Structure formats: C-alpha cells, structure tokens
C-alpha cells in the first residue's frame, strides 16, 4: 500500500525524535554511569600507590629486601586510568573533568615518587642524615643513628629520601580528603 505524504512525514519525524532522544539518553548514561567510575578508580588507585610506596620506603629504610612489584602494578593502573581521565576531559559534555589539574598533580607526585624509589632502591647508602633519621623514627618507629659526616652517595641517598617523604605527604594531602563512594 501507498503511504500518504503526511504518514511519511510523521514517520520521519518520529524516527528523528527517536534518534535524538536516543543520543541524549546515551550521552547522559555515559556521563552519569561510566565516567565517575574512571575517576573513582583513579583516586582509589592513587591511594593504593600511596600505601605501597609507603611500604617500599619502609623496606628501604629498614634495609630489607625491596619489592617494587606491587607499587609498579599500582603505578601502571593509575597511569592507565589517568590517561582515560585525560581522554574523557577532552570529550564534549564532560564538564566534570574540564579541570583535571588536581588529578594531574596526583599523577605527577606518584611518578616523582616512583622515579626516586627506583633510584634509592639501587643505592648502597650507609648513613641517614639527621632529617631522615627523625622522619624514620616518626613514621616507622625506626631508631637509626644519623651521621653528620655523610659521603657523596649517602648525601644523594638522603636527598632523594627527603624528597620522597615530601612528595608522599603532598600525595596524602591530595587524596585523603576526596570523597569516593
């Protein structure tokens, strides 16, 4: 049978409205359902990085065998999630992520901690500086004599440890007050 022109028009309009509604619903579903998870996963992942870097640093300071594998797994996961966040920040309708400056800070702190952990893990330093021995005591109940006469390697080692501690404090500050479901 032949459709009248008004039927065709009605059908076409319906299809267009249906498509537009479908697109809007799709965008909203994506916005409200998939997006927050990437962000939450990133924050949780950053917290795991913090915990495992803390563990690694403790191993280093106590002179134990250092195992970076868990930290590196967490780092890889945080990096992957951060890249997804960056992608989401570039898509339209993502007002929530327009400024991922805090996430960028978190990621760069984790990366800085990572680099320095790699460095000190491979060093054979014998002595703590006064600052590092104080921090080791405060944070890990580690009583370690400090030396005021440090050789070059000890100085470099302590320098990196101090930075790791500083970055870890900054990281903790960034992530601990974020509300995640």
Q: At which residue positions do the language-model features occur?
A:
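C-terminal ends of transmembrane alpha-helices
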Residues: 7, 29-33, 81-84, 88
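Membrane-interfacial segments
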Residues: 33-41
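All-alpha amphipathic helical-bundle segments outside canonical DNA-binding/catalytic cores
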Residues: 98-108
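Pore- and pathway-forming membrane helices of multi-pass small-molecule/ion transporters and channels
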Residues: 1-31
């Amino acid at each position: 049978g032949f459709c009248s022109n008004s039927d065709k028009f009605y059908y076409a309009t319906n299809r267009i409205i249906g498509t537009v509604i479908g697109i809007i619903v799709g965008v909203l579903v994506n916005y409200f359902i998939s997006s927050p998870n990437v962000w939450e996963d990133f924050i949780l992942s950053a917290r795991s990085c913090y915990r495992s870097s803390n563990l690694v640093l403790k191993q280093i300071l106590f002179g134990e065998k250092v195992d970076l594998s868990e930290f590196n797994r967490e780092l890889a996961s945080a990096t992957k999630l951060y890249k997804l966040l960056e992608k989401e920040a570039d898509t339209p309708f993502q007002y929530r992520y327009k400024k991922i400056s805090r996430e960028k800070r978190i990621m760069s702190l984790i990366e800085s901690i990572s680099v320095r952990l790699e460095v000190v893990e491979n060093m054979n330093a014998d002595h703590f500086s006064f600052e590092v021995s104080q921090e080791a005591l405060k944070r890990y109940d580690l009583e370690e004599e400090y030396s005021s006469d440090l050789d070059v390697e000890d100085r470099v080692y302590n320098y990196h440890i101090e930075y790791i501690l500083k970055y870890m404090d900054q990281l903790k500050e960034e992530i601990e007050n974020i509300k995640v479901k």
